[in-house]
Amino acid sequence: MKDNTVPLKLIALLANGEFHSGEQLGETLGMSRAAINKHIQTLRDWGVDVFTVPGKGYSLPEPIQLLNAKQILGQLDGGSVAVLPVIDSTNQYLLDRIGELKSGDACIAEYQQAGRGRRGRKWFSPFGANLYLSMFWRLEQGPAAAIGLSLVIGIVMAEVLRKLGADKVRVKWPNDLYLQDRKLAGILVELTGKTGDAAQIVIGAGINMAMRRVEESVVNQGWITLQEAGINLDRNTLAAMLIRELRAALELFEQEGLAPYLSRWEKLDNFINRPVKLIIGDKEIFGISRGIDKQGALLLEQDGIIKPWMGGEISLRSAEK
């Protein structure tokens, strides 16, 4: 495992957005300017924009707020939350420790080296720019009871963001949040467990907060950040509130399933009563979205007939001209 101590100290010094000379940084960290430059490159590899201005030194384009475990844990009533600077993926971190976790245990990271989205896709995860959060839950009723879970997670995330001031956030079937018709957040639910056995579930969420650019090869749809929409939220408050609300929602979901959430989905549905297309492999199916049914399937109207659609291979997009 690479030692990230120095780059992490460096980012903490640069986090205020001011200029810092290589000399100053070298003195503080007890190393040469050349060594500082090498660690600056690590930060760039993590997706951090570090400017270099001759005669002034290094600076970030704007201050960044780093995650603070003490602040996050101080807003929660117990349960374990790992706050990690650099990790392969928050979901993988929990999956690797599944035997020792309790329902509601969570993990948050500044940077994911191998973040992943639905269908094994890469999830673009620059350092300190977004929120990457995963939570473990053990569903005693088994894997079949998890149907509709990603919808519940989406509703909770949208409601939390709205409470904190991002009041135009909406949900998109089956596992995204949208703002201004662009993707703001994604959800990945990973499940292990056999039929007749409890399901071990790891829920991952990534929220775009302030990233400035993306790798086009990784992001295949229009995206937006809270910052671009003029919304600046405290990352630590957001993380704590999400963990608290997700724990409560998962308890309710365990007892009552999707039923209590159906009307909440309808209020937040980004595409309800709008022309959409479903993409399944290389096939496109056009119709009007009519919300979801009791199982969480997407209801699509074609020629006056409404049919439910369900499945991990379906993508939903707008079909408005």
Curated annotation (Swiss-Prot):
Top-tier EC class: ligase
Effect recorded for T52S: 5-fold increase of repressor activity. Increases binding to DNA
Mutagenesis or variant effect for T52I: Does not affect repressor activity
Catalytic activity: biotin + L-lysyl-[protein] + ATP = N(6)-biotinyl-L-lysyl-[protein] + AMP + diphosphate + H(+)
Activity control note: The switch between the enzymatic activity and the repressor activity is regulated by cellular demand for biotin. The switch occurs by swapping of protein interaction partners by holoBirA. In conditions of high biotin demand, holoBirA associates with apoBCCP to transfer biotin. In conditions of low biotin demand, holoBirA dimerizes, binds DNA and represses transcription of the biotin operon.
Binding-site residues, biotin: S89, T90, N91, Q112, R116, G117, R118, K183
UniProt-recorded Gene Ontology molecular function terms: ATP binding; biotin binding; biotin--[biotin carboxyl-carrier protein] ligase activity; DNA binding; nucleic acid binding; protein homodimerization activity; transcription cis-regulatory region binding
GO BP annotations listed: biotin biosynthetic process; biotin metabolic process; protein modification process; regulation of DNA-templated transcription
Subunit: Monomer in solution. Interacts with BCCP. Homodimerizes to bind DNA. Interaction with the corepressor bio-5'-AMP increases dimerization.
Family: Belongs to the biotin--protein ligase family.
Annotated protein name in UniProt: Bifunctional ligase/repressor BirA
Species this chain originates from: Escherichia coli (strain K12)
Gene name as annotated: birA
